[in-house]
Amino acid sequence: MVRTLYLNESDRDIRVVMDGPSILIKDPERADRRIPIRFISRVVIFGNIWISSDVLTALAGQNIPLICISKWASNISISMPFQFTYPAHCIDLELVLKDQQKAMDFTNWARQKRAFMKTEVIRRIYPNADISCSNYREIISFLMPEDREKWLTVKNTLKALFWSLITEHLISLGLDPHCGIINRKSAFGLVRDYAYIMSPEMDYQALQFFRSDSIDTLIRSDRKPCLLTAKGIHNIINRFENRQYIVRRLVGEIKDKLYELMGTDYEGKLSRLL
């Protein structure tokens, strides 16, 4: 079973190198870890990690995306494989972009889906209350920590995890992550489209993080910007992994809508265009 490889910055001199068909994680204070690359679906790096270029090219060769998150979760970088072929799905998606009616259909569907997810989040937080999703932003603002820097740090970290899963999903489908419908002409436009729809789930996981016991051991606010501790990163990853069945279901629903708009005759459309 393929899994996500998470690597977190440490005071120890951790090095990541290739060893045959496996990635070798060398830790001076622990036994070396060897992970066959065929068991890795994506790699997420928090902070600074020494990693050899052989690892980067091996990941690209296996269509495995690499996501890097800065120490303070202020920047996200995504390294993708370089595709020499132009999948038929990409052409179908471009046809959707050129069809204003189909593009509008997807945009309206995305807004409705996002509104439904907002309602679901409100119901989880206040199960006995009859609150409209029109009050969603006020509710989230009320429940946020007073220190907004803490919120941004956690939310950006979650956004990176969601982006990593979405990017992996799109690559596996042969869809261009940059070919956005809502976020046109934007880097990773289609990833942003997915993330726009799924943002209420990010809010919910962020709120749950701040309900954790001993929150002061999870995030440091004695310096700006705020910094997640190793324990805090572990908390966020566990929460994300435990709710992946929901996240993957949402990803699948968005994919189904895209396929509905693109149609199913990929080979026919491709041959006509070529």
Where are the language model's segments positioned?
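General secondary-structure edge motif
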Residues: 23, 39-40, 142
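N- or domain-start disorder-to-order transition segments that initiate the globular core
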Residues: 1-35
